[in-house]
A protein has these predicted regions:
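N-terminal amphipathic/basic leader segments beginning at the initiator methionine
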Residues: 1-18
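N-terminal extracellular/periplasmic Venus flytrap/periplasmic-binding protein-like
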Residues: 11-14, 25-31, 35, 43-45, ...
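Glycine-rich loop/linker segments at domain edges
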Residues: 13, 17-20, 103-160, 227-230
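Active-site pocket-shaping loop/turn-to-helix segments
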Residues: 15-42, 60-63, 86-100, 112, ...
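Conserved beta-ketoacyl condensing-enzyme motif
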Residues: 24-114, 119-135, 191-205, 296-297, ...
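Conserved catalytic cysteine-centered active-site region
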Residues: 58-112, 144-151, 219-258, 339-366, ...
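Active-site-proximal alpha-helical scaffold in enzymes
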Residues: 88-119, 157-187, 265-272, 337-338, ...
């Protein structure tokens, strides 16, 4: 008999600027994870021996993020030695994939309770430092039609007719919503402040929000991907997308996701496991999906992934109350919203990665914490969480409050 996978809680760290002068540079990735594991245990007086596994997404699992950080963090946090650990990478989908895997484990009856989430310290373990043939081997570059993601985003904007002012307006709204959400206390429930080993505060709120951002200031920024386009990457796109004559380069640092540090975890379990632990479920995971998409444009995967999840759940886009569509670049959520004909009023209502940053392996789990809190605050029922994924993939998860 298939079990229902419930979400009992979801918490995250604030996002710190992913540079050496960022507030979380002093905090190692295992420290960020340790803080959340300890917080989860203390919040619920959780008997950690009831947890079967810790599954963490991490896009760059080398250096300080290597050696199966999930298992080592569980030991470091003082959890029961019976708690196993798994680190996985599905590029930017890793944090949400961890939650989906945890749900599958619970639904199958293989495990009863799992902590799932992700971590990425981009200031200490730089993006791409794990290498990989996809972008380092010229033969594989050609075979996989490798193009920098920003050019993929610019291609989406070109195909959809999103202008520079359109994507800048979206970015401006991301900052406005994030600033308003923090000012209104919407993040207070799920964000766990990060202190150092001596208990000194390092960061208690997302560090990269710029409340005064506007279309006029963003207009002064130069597009980031004109030069790589001239190096031959635009030609790769134009060979595959013959309906356009040129790529309109509209994305820049101000309307793209920021490089940040952070971690997030969710507690997922069966009804019986929750009852045994004295926990009350907040939501259930209704359906999840992953799918491959065209690899050159790379960032259109959310649409087919969401459609796949909706079809399997017997639902329609109109059944979803709130959407979290990762803001890798402004054109990505704009494209998905356009494909499903949904209002941006219900998309990323408290800001997103353009304003608060994209800590790669942690982002999917962070989106889960955000939308779960907001469903409860608005007394709504259903949410879709989705991300575009490197290599041309999409991931989607549908949750429902209980």
């Amino acid at each position: 008999m298939t079990e229902t996978a419930y979400i009992y809680d979801a918490i995250r760290t604030p996002r710190g600027k992913g540079k050496k002068d960022g507030s979380l540079y002093q905090a190692s990735p295992i420290w960020l994870t340790r803080i959340l594991l300890k917080e989860m245990q203390q919040r619920h007086n959780l008997d950690t021996s009831l947890v079967d596994d810790v599954v963490l997404g991490c896009v760059t699992p080398v250096g300080e993020q290597g050696s199966d950080i999930a298992r080592i963090a569980a030991i470091d946090a003082g959890w029961a030695q019976s708690v196993a650990g798994l680190t996985l990478s599905r590029f930017c989908a890793s944090g949400l994939e961890s939650i989906n895997l945890a749900a599958a484990k619970v639904m199958s009856g293989m495990e009863d309770m799992v902590v799932a989430g992700g971590v990425e310290s981009m200031s200490r373990v730089p993006m791409g430092s794990d290498g990989g043939a996809w972008y380092m081997d010229p033969r594989v570059n050609e075979a996989t039609h490798f193009v920098p993601q920003g050019i993929g985003a610019d291609t989406i904007a070109t195909l959809k007719g999103f202008s520079r002012s359109d994507v800048d307006a979206f970015a401006t709204e991301s900052h406005r919503r994030a600033a308003q959400a923090w000012e209104s206390g919407y993040y207070d429930k799920s964000v766990v402040p990060v202190t150092d080993i001596n208990g000194m505060m390092l960061l208690d709120k997302d560090e990269t929000i710029r409340p005064n951002t506007n279309v006029e200031t963003l207009a002064g920024l130069k597009p980031s991907f004109i030069m790589p386009g001239k190096m031959g990457f635009d030609s790769v796109i134009l060979d595959r997308y013959t309906t356009i004559e040129t790529v309109n380069h509209v994305h820049h640092a101000g309307n793209s996701s920021g490089i940040v540090d952070g971690a997030a975890i969710c507690l997922v379990g069966s009804a019986a496991a929750g009852q045994k632990a004295g926990l009350k479920p907040r939501a259930k995971i209704t359906m999840a999906s992953v799918i491959g998409s065209e690899p050159a444009i790379m960032l259109t995967g959310p649409t087919p992934a969401c459609q796949k999840a909706l079809d399997k759940a017997g639902m329609q886009a109109s059944d979803i109350d709130l959407w979290e569509i990762n803001e890798a670049f402004a054109a990505v959520p704009m494209n998905t919203a356009d494909d499903f004909d949904i209002s941006l009023d219900i998309v990323n209502v408290n800001g997103g990665a353009i304003s608060m940053g994209h800590p790669l392996g942690a982002t999917g789990a962070m989106l889960m914490t955000t939308v779960l809190d907001e469903l409860e605050r608005r007394d709504l029922q259903t949410a879709m969480i989705t991300l575009c994924v490197g290599g041309g993939m999409g991931i989607a998860t549908i949750i429902e409050r209980v």
